[in-house]
């Protein structure tokens, strides 16, 4: 495999080209990209966990250091002022010397407020991208050039097309997440609580709870019906029925986002339903290709959901077409089939149809779908179908003309299992789709 250093060199060349184009289009001289700052908890003296500006970590794999600055103009070597204070209260990261530092000019910044004297004197035509607009104003950046929408839309659109460096980082993140999922399944099988399963996951991935790209969803039994369940019970339930784990990892700022669901027993209806959702998810991925709208795959999976609802006699006496047409599949899969993935878990530009930021909303019938793009080579997306038994979504169907088609007895029997979600991360290539998750043999 090509070294990360050579992949990074090409990555920087791509970012430089995008920057030149953006600066020319919006008549700017350079971009000043801020890693961010620490923000204290209200009325307290300690900060919230630091989360770096995604536009900053697109350039350099520096994810834990606030008060850093990048100056890029698309021509000259990117200039990084790296925050390096004299501080005996807190850990101070050393000046970087890694695979990427040959391609970036790295300069120590001893004082957070010292950046002003180091920037070019003429700043009226520099754009600021970062989370602290007031800092940009203090530096003399024009208000109209602070997080300029056109520039950000342009950069976001092209972030959809991953460089080979980015794909290499995402494959490494996959490896970490797969290790975590295997450790978590083992913890579940041994009867651990959600809290302890989460600890097992973090240990296996080498992450702290604040390092994972999103809060781990560690859901036993009926908790799997809460789509973003993050409570983490300390006590294991008396009876283990099911386990849904939606948890990722991060490598050089790039995310993995995987979900698996396990049944405690292998010989019940729920276990068969888990197997069937998994099979249908793989079957859908096998049909994916460049040039097709992501929306089409979402709609196709509702047809697959209908097939499973019929097979398992959860919905009866109704054709699969009628189920989808009348949205009887909706309460069972209330979220989208997935989303773009990259520097952010819900990566940017899912609705953007061009580099001017033209927005195409999700279909009215499926408002929670996070992507309406035509799939193109270089895109990375999640494919994460599910079937859930959520009373608040099922309740409206208990009355009315369609109620008789719901096998309420079967639904009540499945509700204690919560739900099912299976999620892989896929790369769209010119002539094939790469399933980064299954390539690592995660069942």
Swiss-Prot record:
Keywords: Dipeptidase, Hydrolase, Manganese, Metal-binding, Metalloprotease, Protease
EC number(s) on file: 3.4.13.9
Catalytic activity line of the entry: Xaa-L-Pro dipeptide + H2O = an L-alpha-amino acid + L-proline
GO molecular function, one term: phosphoric triester hydrolase activity
Pfam families per the UniProt record, alphabetical: PepQ_N, Peptidase_M24
GO BP terms in the entry: proteolysis
Cofactor(s) this protein cannot do without: Mn(2+)
Chain positions recorded as Mn(2+) 1 binding sites: 257, 339, 384, 423
Residues annotated as binding Mn(2+) 2: 246, 257, 423
One annotated Gene Ontology cellular component of this protein: cytosol
Cofactor note: Binds 2 manganese ions per subunit.
Transmembrane regions listed in the UniProt entry: none
CDD domains found in the cross-reference section: Prolidase
Family membership: Belongs to the peptidase M24B family. Bacterial-type prolidase subfamily.
Function noted in UniProt: Splits dipeptides with a prolyl residue in the C-terminal position.
HAMAP family linked: X_Pro_dipeptid
Protein name, per record: Xaa-Pro dipeptidase
């Amino acid at each position: 495999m090509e070294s990360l250093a050579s992949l990074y060199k090409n990555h920087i060349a791509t970012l430089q080209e995008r920057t030149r184009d953006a600066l020319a289009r919006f008549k700017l001289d350079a971009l000043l990209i801020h890693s961010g700052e620490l923000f204290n908890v209200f009325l307290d003296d300690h900060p919230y966990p630091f989360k770096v500006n995604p536009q900053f970590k697109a350039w350099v794999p520096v994810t834990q250091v606030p008060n850093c600055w990048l100056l890029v103009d698309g021509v000259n070597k990117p200039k990084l002022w790296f925050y390096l204070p004299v501080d005996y209260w807190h850990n101070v990261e050393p000046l970087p010397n890694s695979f990427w530092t040959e391609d970036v000019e790295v300069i120590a910044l001893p004082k957070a407020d010292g950046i002003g004297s180091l920037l070019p004197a003429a700043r009226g035509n520099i754009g600021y991208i970062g989370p602290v607009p007031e800092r940009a104003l203090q530096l003399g950046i024009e208000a109209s050039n602070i997080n300029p929408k056109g520039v950000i839309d342009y950069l976001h659109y092209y972030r959809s097309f991953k460089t080979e460096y980015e794909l290499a980082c995402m494959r490494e993140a996959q490896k970490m997440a797969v290790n975590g999922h295997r450790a978590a399944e083992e913890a579940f099988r041994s009867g651990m609580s959600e809290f302890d399963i989460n600890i097992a996951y973090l240990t296996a991935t080498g992450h702290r709870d604040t390092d994972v790209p999103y809060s781990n969803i560690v859901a036993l039994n009926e908790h799997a019906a809460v789509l973003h369940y993050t409570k983490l019970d300390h006590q294991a339930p008396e009876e283990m029925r099911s386990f849904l784990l939606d948890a990722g990892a991060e490598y050089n700022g790039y995310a993995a986002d995987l979900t698996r669901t396990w049944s405690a027993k292998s010989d019940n209806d729920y276990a068969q339903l888990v197997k069937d959702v998994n099979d249908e998810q793989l079957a859908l991925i096998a049909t994916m290709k460049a040039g097709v709208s992501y929306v089409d795959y979402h709609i196709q999976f509702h047809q697959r959901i209908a097939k499973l609802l019929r097979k398992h006699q959860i919905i009866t006496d109704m054709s699969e077409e009628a189920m989808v047409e009348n949205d009887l599949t909706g309460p069972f899969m209330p979220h989208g089939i997935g989303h773009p993935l990259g520097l952010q878990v819900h990566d940017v530009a899912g609705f953007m149809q061009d580099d001017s930021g033209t927005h195409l909303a999700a279909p009215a019938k499926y408002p929670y779908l996070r992507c309406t793009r035509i799939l193109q080579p270089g895109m990375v997306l999640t494919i994460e179908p599910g079937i859930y038994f959520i009373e608040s979504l099922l309740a409206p169907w208990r009355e009315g003309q369609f109620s008789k088609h719901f096998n309420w007895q079967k639904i009540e029997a499945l509700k204690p299992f919560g739900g099912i979600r299976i999620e892989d991360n896929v790369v769209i290539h010119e002539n094939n789709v790469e399933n980064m998750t299954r390539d690592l043999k995660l069942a």
